[in-house]
């Protein structure tokens, strides 16, 4: 990984950019960027989502009466389920995986040193179910090692990897593998997670996130060439592609982001399959949500730092839009911080050579932002209602989530990017016990 001197320089750079803009031009220009960057990205996501829907997605068969997918040459599919302390969820997860309408599957559950009753539950199920194989690791090694173990044991070239608390839709495995059968350069396919936990405000807000933000982002990124990350909770991989890049890294806090960049930097492509539904549990407390998003943001910063030099090779030009998007979003977060600090110093009466009269959006900007949130909701509802019909019940929370999304992104980026740049180090990434929600919706 890039040494500490370089990473410290990067941190100084993202702080100096907004300061230089404010000092040499004006604080007002700096704050315009704070408003217009989320505005611009939201428009990009809306346009990209609509384009993906019109020219691809709307033609794909879907619905209760749709026939089961028929895959070319009837390949076998290995569903790998890494488990750590999943006694409350793993049985339901395995039954959903085995209930696929596509029959040529095997399920491999990897118990990563669980300390609860997960081992006993898996052994009992394996004795009763022929298509289920169970592997026990003596000690907790982390999700990346569990996935590697499952991949080594799998019989198929096509691996569908899900979490130990995720419920696959009846055709998810077939849908998510299909793009790899028709394009030999597709190394991975990411699915479409849907939220089960929605009994609290935090849970309902995340329904809005996955309905109005995440899906549009994935569709847009797929249109302009590359995807920032596969979904860690449901993704399919071509085993030969994984072998070429060395499988998952065990020293990265988010193995899903890391493997996505490793594949794409080796000229493999990643596809988004919205019909590969997977029902998941998510945090329903603010503390749980914060810890999860901080981990995601830290993982993105680690991958950014790890791959920064490789990105500039000419063969990786398709990754440049992701690089610039991540860089500008990070600069946006630190611009917000600098703006708040300058404004607070001015309020305290300290003389500065920088003029900043306000940090809140103007009346016109506020109207534009509200209009854009509403437009983003309408577009998302039109697209996602195909897969989840009760989204209107979360109408209020979905409309306002774009604002919450950017505020959460601001806070987690500031903390995680600073942490990674000041303390770049390699160590084994192991499981933590996440907030899985209070009640399951």
Swiss-Prot record:
GO molecular function, one term: acetylglucosaminyltransferase activity
EC number: 2.4.1.-
InterPro entries found in the cross-reference section: Glyco_trans_2-like (IPR001173), Nucleotide-diphossugar_trans (IPR029044), PGA_PgaC/IcaA (IPR023853)
GO cellular component annotations of the record: plasma membrane
Transmembrane region(s): 5-25, 33-53, 331-351, 363-383, 395-415
GO BP, sorted A to Z: cell adhesion involved in biofilm formation
Residues in compartment: Cytoplasmic: 26-32, 352-362, 416-441
Chief location: membrane
UniProt enzyme class: transferase
Record-linked Gene3D superfamilies: Spore Coat Polysaccharide Biosynthesis Protein SpsA, Chain A
Keywords in alphabetical order: Cell inner membrane, Cell membrane, Glycosyltransferase, Membrane, Transferase, Transmembrane, Transmembrane helix
Localization of this protein: Cell inner membrane
Membrane topology listed for this record: Multi-pass membrane protein
Pfam families associated with the record: Glycos_transf_2
Top-rank taxon: Bacteria
Periplasmic side: 1-4, 54-330, 384-394
Family as reported in the entry's similarity comment: Belongs to the glycosyltransferase 2 family.
Function: Probable N-acetylglucosaminyltransferase that catalyzes the polymerization of single monomer units of UDP-N-acetylglucosamine to produce the linear homomer poly-beta-1,6-N-acetyl-D-glucosamine (PGA), a biofilm adhesin polysaccharide.
Protein name: Poly-beta-1,6-N-acetyl-D-glucosamine synthase
Organism annotation: Escherichia coli O157:H7
């Amino acid at each position: 990984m890039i040494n500490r001197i370089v990473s410290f320089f990067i941190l100084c750079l993202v702080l100096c950019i907004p300061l230089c803009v404010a000092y040499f031009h004006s604080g007002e220009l700096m704050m315009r960027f704070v408003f217009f960057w989320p505005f611009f990205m939201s428009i990009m996501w809306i346009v990209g989502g609509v384009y993906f829907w019109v020219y691809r997605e709307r033609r794909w068969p879907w619905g209760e009466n749709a026939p089961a997918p028929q895959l070319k040459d009837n390949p076998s599919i290995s569903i790998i389920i890494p488990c750590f302390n999943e006694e409350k969820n793993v049985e339901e997860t395995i039954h959903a995986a085995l209930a696929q309408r596509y029959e040529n599957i095997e399920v491999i559950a990897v118990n990563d040193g669980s300390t609860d009753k997960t081992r006993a539950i898996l052994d009992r199920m394996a004795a009763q179910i022929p298509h289920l194989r169970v592997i026990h690791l003596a000690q907790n090694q982390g999700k990346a090692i569990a996935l590697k173990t499952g991949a080594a044991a799998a019989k198929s070239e096509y691996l569908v990897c899900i979490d130990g608390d995720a419920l696959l839709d009846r055709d998810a495995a077939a849908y998510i593998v299909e793009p790899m059968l028709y394009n030999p350069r597709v190394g991975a396919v990411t699915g479409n997670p849907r939220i089960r936990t929605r009994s609290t405000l935090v849970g309902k807000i995340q329904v809005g996130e996955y309905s109005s933000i995440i899906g549009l982002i994935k569709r847009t990124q797929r249109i302009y060439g590359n995807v920032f990350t596969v979904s860690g909770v449901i993704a399919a991989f071509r085993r030969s592609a994984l072998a070429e890049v060395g499988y998952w890294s065990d020293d990265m806090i988010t193995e899903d982001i890391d493997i996505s960049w490793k594949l794409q930097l080796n000229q493999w492509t990643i596809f988004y399959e919205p019909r590969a539904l997977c029902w998941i549990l998510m945090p329903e407390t603010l503390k749980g949500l914060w810890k999860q998003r901080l981990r995601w943001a830290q993982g993105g910063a680690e991958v950014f730092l790890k791959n920064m030099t490789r990105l500039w090779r000419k063969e990786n030009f398709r990754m440049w839009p992701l690089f610039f998007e991540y860089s500008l979003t990070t600069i946006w977060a630190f611009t917000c911080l600098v703006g708040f600090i300058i404004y607070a110093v001015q309020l305290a009466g300290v003389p500065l050579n920088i003029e900043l009269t306000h940090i809140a959006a103007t009346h016109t900007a506020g109207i534009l932002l509200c209009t854009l949130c509403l437009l983003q909701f309408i577009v998302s509802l039109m697209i996602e209602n195909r897969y989840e019909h009760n989204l209107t019940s979360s109408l209020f929370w979905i409309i306002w989530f774009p604002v919450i999304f950017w505020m959460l992104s601001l806070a987690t980026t500031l903390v995680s990017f600073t942490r990674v740049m000041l303390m770049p180090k390699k160590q084994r990434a192991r499981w933590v016990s996440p907030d899985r929600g209070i009640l399951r919706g």
